[in-house]
Amino acid sequence: MAPDDESKKRATRKSTKRWKEEHQVATEIPERFREGDDEDEDCTAGHALNKSVFGMIAAASSIVDFNARFDAQSSDEEYDLGKPTRQSSESHINRSSIDQKMGKFEGHRRLLSESKILRSFSRFSSRSKSKSSNTIARGSRTPSPLRESRQEPTSPEIRYSPLQPKDTPVMSRMLEARAELSLRPSFEMPRKSKDPAEVDDERTSPDSLAERLMEIFKFETPEDVLEEYPCWLMKSVLLQGYMYITTKHICFYAYLPKKANEVVKSGYLSKSGRHNPKYNRYWFRLKDDVLSYYTNPSDLYFPSGNIDLRYGISASIVEKEKGKDSTHFTVETHQRKYNFNADSAPSAKEWVKALQKIIFRSHNDGDSVKISLPIENIIDIEDSRIIDFADTCKIRIIDNDETYAIDEYFFSFFTNGKLALSVLKILVGDTAAQKIPEELLSPLSTADDSRGSSKRTSFQVSRDRKLHGPSVQPNAPALEETVRATLSPLLAPGAGSPRASTDMSLSSSDIFRRSLDINKHGRRSIDLNRLTTEHHRSNSANSISTRRSLSTNRLDQEKRTSKQGSSDSYVHSLEEPGSSEALPSASDETQASASQILRGSDVFLSPTIQHSPSVACNRNKDEIQGPKSRSLTSPIKSADVSPTRTQRPQHPKHAATTGSVSDSNVGQAEISSGPSLQSIVKAGSYPLQRAAGFAGYLNRHSKRMSTLLASESMGYVEKVSGMWKGGKKHYEEPHGIPRDNEMPSIGDDDDNRDGATPADRFRDHFALPPDEKLHATYFGYLQRVLPLYGKIYISDRSFCFRSLLPGTRTKFILPLKDIENVDKEKGFRFGYSGLVITIRGHEEIFFEFNQAENRDDCAITLLQNVETMQYMQDSGLLTMYERESAEMAGAEHRALIQARRGIRSEHDIDMHKAADGGSQSISFDDPRASILNFKPTEPLRITCLTIGSRGDVQPYIALCKGLMAEGHQTKIATHLEFKEWIESHGIEFAPVDGDPAELMRICVENGMFTVSFLKEASSKFRGWIDDLLSSSWRACQNSDILIESPSAMAGIHIAEALRIPYFRAFTMPWTRTRAYPHAFAVPEHKLGGSYNYVTYLMFDTVFWRAISGQVNRWRQKELNLQATGLEKMQPNKVPFLYNFSPSVVVPPLDYSDWIRVTGYWFLDEGANYTPPKDLTDFIANARADGKRLVYVGFGSIVVADSAVLTKTVVASVLKADVRCILSKGWSDRLEKKGANNVEIPLPPEIFQIKSAPHDWLFSQVDAAAHHGGAGTTGASLRAGIPTIIRPFFGDQFFFGQRVEDLGVGVLIKKINVSVFSRALWEATHSERIITKARVLGEQIRKENGVDTAIQSIYRDMEYAKSLIKCKEGKSDDDTLEDSEESWTFIGDDTDPELIKRFYDWESMAHSGTLSDKNMMAWSGSDVASAALSPTRKAA
């Protein structure tokens, strides 16, 4: 390392250490908050049994496995099919503050992108150095004159910590990491990127089109542009672009930006196995360059297999019967052919189109397609009638003057085609290529279709010429240039494997620039005789070059090795057992990793005889070269197909699908003359007819047997035993520069001896992009149906798991951006340590470790990576280099547009102006949107039925105001005490019996659905329920739509009696899911998806059994309906509107399509609120004194002793040294004294208010502490302030847990001075919590829950009506045998047959010709098979 580099590194370490020292005091919790005498006390604790029935079950279930999960069902072959390994590249982490403007940073990036420094980005990673601030960052909240003067300092930046020594105690690392995490803000908000159209090109901007073309296509001098035409390049797809005809070249340019992290298509398909022709049905998802398939669409983190389309060759329809549209199609890769069967012919065509586009993109380097054809190389130009409505020309061109391979390019012109063809023919009237003798030209191969661009690659032709030795014609004219293109050739399967290179992929301009320099010195070809002779002198195959000279990745520095498919990966050679070729060297097994040894061991896999392509290759060369060359030949394959953007060295690697290790490797070290233990074992597995050779082999090598057993057997045993023992391994510093291509990882020397780094194998196992960087690995158990032993991988973007047990193929891929929190808990088994990963919208995933030290290390490493991931711009969707490449391609595209405008010809008509805008994404219209998503032509009478506190009523006021703005008549039926408030907003009111304060008292004193609650409710609320049902029936008369909170209990029966559409709406989860527990049954510790799902079943059952008798009597007496039950009501099929934010409660994957998480329904009343002067003065004084201001209020909660609670709050505020706005609200509602009476004198640091609008109040404070009600929680989160929640009952525990999981606040289970004061200090000083809360607040403020809810009502209106029609058609004695029937509506939204059926069904339904039975039959069979939209699935 250079001295200046070393000094920079030391300076970085010093600055990192200095940054830690500066902030250590600020992030450490002060001593006064550490411990307290009242740590275990709770001033709000009740005297009665306050334990929920569900809590008791959860506590008793600690010895019961509630975490049984559906295991992924594998087909007969799976994902890892021997794909080549990949070279990692670096991604740049932007560490500038989230509060800073990006202008300066973008300018810096622009300068970087234009400099030559970027050429070396594949080896270096830049580290930005910026000053950190000691001040606490504040969120951008609702503007207020009281807060405008407050400074908004920047938040601290991430610094790389030095590599931890191997013997560093894990506790020290944990404490250090916790200190860093508390300091570190979390940037979940994507950075504001500059519009590409606004990026100025700071280079010297040539004005002429000729100079632009010289820059883009790297001509030596500007060439006059004769003509330019919009045209289409015809390959497997049609690519729209422009043809530029200059004096020396015919150039084609198309802007083809890549799209990262985008699901292109998803749906059900049937797939046949490798050896089993039976088709198995899977859920497929096409994302980026990978086609993944799953046994369960809700388990997207457990793929059954992956198909890497970067190695794809083609996707095509397979005709089974002539004249009929086929539903079968195939996907070919360099290794094998995959067979698929779609549900319909249009669906198959859509899949093939999508796959062809992805394969085409993946074989292009950069974000633009460039083809440069030298005119002197063109043989002829012919008309080709491929498309009837377009003029198409075929250009035959010689690739270079060494191989004389002929390529064909097809271009179609939709306008001015005749003129373009005449110009081209005149231009190539007399070229050097036409003077080359015919015997030198390579014959065209017929393997490719007529539209392929490359009929035969240069390497194939060169190989044939070297083997057959054609005579060279010295009088052939020389060709000065070669064809250059960013597109790679597509070879037939088995012809080769993907190319490999240690270089990062370059942008299109870099590719052109560097290929130009190489082409000046002529092209290089490979001499097979020389290669095979010199093979043993090198550890890797010689570099060879294919005809695509445009990509440097295919030139000098490629390392070629043969790569077998997984079926050929475990090769038992039939050569002489005594030869070194027949038996692998010692490094094949003893130098492999433990998992490779286990998978490749003959103990677990019976050896089979498999033929390898290399055998035939050797034989062919033997026939040509003679017997003398037999001992020196090695299997060499032809030119390799290139994957996407980044190439990497080829290595034999572990094939997870077949459990095998490739034995054939061209790039292996010198063939060992000595035997190995594993070679003897493998030799013993050969057929008996080779026994003579085997005996001779033993006789020759028996003298060295003792040395072999002593030296090599321990390597095998130690690695396998070490794998089963478990452990951990770090491959780099947690957030530093990857060391895969710099130096062997710590303790990983053996793993790297075969040339493949652990990071390479990791990326191959999970089909991850080449720039994915491996940080650490661990051995542990994944808790599913049974504990599944395997290996855990943590990278900079993903958390992965791979099972190691023989016979299992489970893989788990979890993006770090989907992780909400990581908790450490006790294991399910005695002596094991547990790790719980909370995932957005998914059930928790549990892991177990046999050592607590490994569990702690894994938790800290994972948390650090998750936090770093949130800092990365665009959440790591694109690396910095890819962004730079995309920007450069965009700049080239805009420059061409600008240059063309100056010489716009008559050829550019309107239909081709779309090409200027780049590649537009294809948008598929949802067929249901045009049918169901409509606004009613006439105003509707909408009634909202709810009971409870003020927080339960307020969202309905906001919804009704939105509906009134749409022209509808609204009414709210609730408790009498809210009448004035509701009518003040112009909403009609209808009374419902019941005292919310009495209900609140029972809930608080007894807990929700506890034993004492059930006792008191059954004794006191029998009459109350009867009154509630009767009053609700009267209140809901004259309604067209009923929207009800399910806690009101009567709505679903009233809607059935009135025969009107019925919707449910609630503030807490009420629908069965595995992602979250029922809001009334939140356990102390996470218990997994099975427990979560069971809580809903138990609650529904218990709740219905408690009220079913009264409800059925009421139905028969007042509603004139038959008695019912849960099976007949089908409550899980009712359309549901959840009025909380999808950013707070992420919609689970198993929610049905009629379950909508709309966002909060806020009733903003702060605009008309005038705060009292003493309150504004108090706030101003707190700001002037530099004190943090908090809000404390427990709203609609009744406590046993409000005086003790007030005293505790006062003491905590004084201890935390903050100012407090105290709102007591209903906390003393049932007490005889007035609500304004204060039990103890309040100090000047506390200001008491009775009430204030949350939208105004929370914008004035720095943190809020409250009970965790849905409405109050939503208001504090929207304000972007940290939230402290002390739950009392009901859904408050659920939202408290969500706040803690999201990292935007603190959940406390008890209130005392020690706990509450520490929570106040942490909420006002933790930069991590403050920043996360600010980012979440910005996300919530962008939502409009009321508008989303209204549109959801419109969209699901017909579905709600269909439920009423189904019930009308049932006879009295109908038992609804199919009551639990559910359909999954998933798949192809553009299926024309499906759209037609929807319209037919809609028209028949309106005309009355469709019977209810037919309606149900159609919605079952056809929709299940045709599959409509993701997530329409009954829970």
UniProtKB/Swiss-Prot annotation:
Residues 211-258, 760-826 form the GRAM domain. Residues 85-99, 134-143, 539-554, 628-647, 657-671 have a biased composition (Polar residues). The keyword Cell membrane does not apply. Residues 262-360 form the PH domain. PROSITE patterns: PH_DOMAIN. Residues 123-133 have a biased composition (Low complexity). It catalyses: a sterol + UDP-alpha-D-glucose = a sterol 3-beta-D-glucoside + UDP + H(+); ergosterol + UDP-alpha-D-glucose = ergosteryl 3-beta-D-glucoside + UDP + H(+). GO terms for cellular component: phagophore assembly site membrane. UDP-alpha-D-glucose binds at residues 949-950, 952, 1252, 1254, 1267, 1271-1272, 1291-1292. It is found in: Cytoplasm; Preautophagosomal structure membrane. It holds the Pfam family EryCIII-like_C. Its main location: cytoplasm. Residues 189-206, 527-537, 729-742 have a biased composition (Basic and acidic residues). Belongs to the glycosyltransferase 28 family. This is Sterol 3-beta-glucosyltransferase. It comes from Sclerotinia sclerotiorum (strain ATCC 18683 / 1980 / Ss-1) (White mold). The lineage of its organism: Eukaryota, Fungi, Dikarya, Ascomycota, Pezizomycotina. The gene is atg26.
